[in-house]
Amino acid sequence: MSRPALRWVVAEGETLALGVWLDRHAPGSQPSLGDGRVFVNGKRITDPGYPLEPGHCVELYAARVSDGEVRVLARFEGVVLVDKPAGLATEPDHAGIAASVVARAAELLDTPRAELHAMSRLDVGVSGVVLLTLDRGARRRIEALRDAGRVRRRYVAIGSGGPNPTSGVWDAPIGRGRGTLRSAFGRDAESATTRYRTAAQAGSASLLALEPVTGRTHQLRVHAAHAGCPLYGDPAYGGPKRLVQADGAVLTLRRIALHAAWVELPFLGGVRVESALPAALLELWSALGGAAEDGASALE
């Protein structure tokens, strides 16, 4: 393991829950719990309620930098669409210790980072199309289109189980859950709607085509889990972290099986900006017994 980016020793009188302690010493770093980047006395801790005692050593590791590269897919009228690899944050870490899509895109475009604004945010373990704006006018235009429901987004996911019925609409409000997680019908829940379709099945697994109507935090992950098909590689919401194959080999999932496959904007004349399904998801679907051509059905 690499060296931690930040390390503290809990002082006398700081008998606090880990989440509260992080808020005090590293504001904005609580998402690192869900990412598995916080250790106490050498043990990975994901529970924000974990009790700290004086003398405990708390270590915060930087987010794992993805091996993939950010690619510019399209640029027009103050809008940039880029391809995000899994393992890379969309925006800089709140603790200031992680690389990000925004930072890399700024380098590629030779643009000051402060001028780029992420209009769509993918979780660290998710890949695909991210929409950025270069100026305030473009930001307002995209916000207006999004509020009017005219920005279409298609995600492809692999669920450990299948929804019943196989297609339809998930309409469950999403609120706060434990720590930084979200929960269907959780605290302070807000309306959340996702259109879904089962593109293919392989045993108990399902290849899902998802279109979010709203944009709540972790919406697709929460809705899939609530529907009984948590996503592979998403243990935070009950998804499997490993897959034991027929020959006994164990496939460890290092990302969430969720990919932002395309975005469609009205001023593109109906043209979709696409990101190809990543090899890791194709490999997983094949290992589950799925067919190579199933991916095309999920993109339709």
What positions do the PLM features span?
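RNA pseudouridine synthases
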Residues: 1-300
